[in-house]
Amino acid sequence: MTNIKKVFKEEPRLVLPFYDNDGQLSGVTCRALRGEALRYLTVKIRDGVPLLFGIDSVNKSKPIYVVQGPIDSLFLDNAIAVGGTSFGKLNETGLDKDKLIVVFDNQPRNKEVCKLIDKNIELGYNVVLWPQTIVEKDINEMVMAGHNVKKIIKDNTYTGLTAKMKFIGWKRC
């Protein structure tokens, strides 16, 4: 039995569809329910279309939260998920950059996450920098711990030079 067949046979998964702006299926991701090896398996169906979970259902006239994982996006109103750390495709979405609030996982020691946050600040995006009192890694964990995630995000969203200064104090890499 191949490894992929073994993964699907032995581990239950939640299948989440990705649609494009026109409501056409562009891919799916399969999330492990037990959190074992290969937490996410993603299959892209159409080339040239960024995989953005929830893009087909956001209100483009309101602020849009951009998070890493599809599960995290379900805890916020008007949110999309990039699936992992592929935030580099935001400029291809046709969404108004000023309406986007980029919400990375709370990983101040992760060099890749730090690079991506720095890049998004340089590109002029609104970014969330989690307060040091938050120890949970992602929105899902924060909600389970009883945090008011919407308020924390509202109070810790920065852009421009303020974001740059806050980022310098936040990162640990």
Question: Whereabouts are the PLM-identified features?
Answer:
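Replication-associated primase and helicase/ATPase modules
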Residues: 1-7, 17-24, 66, 95-103, ...
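Phosphate-handling DNA/RNA-contact segment within nucleic-acid enzymes
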Residues: 1-99, 112-114
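Aromatic/basic micro-patches that form nucleic-acid/chromatin recognition or nuclease catalytic surfaces
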Residues: 106
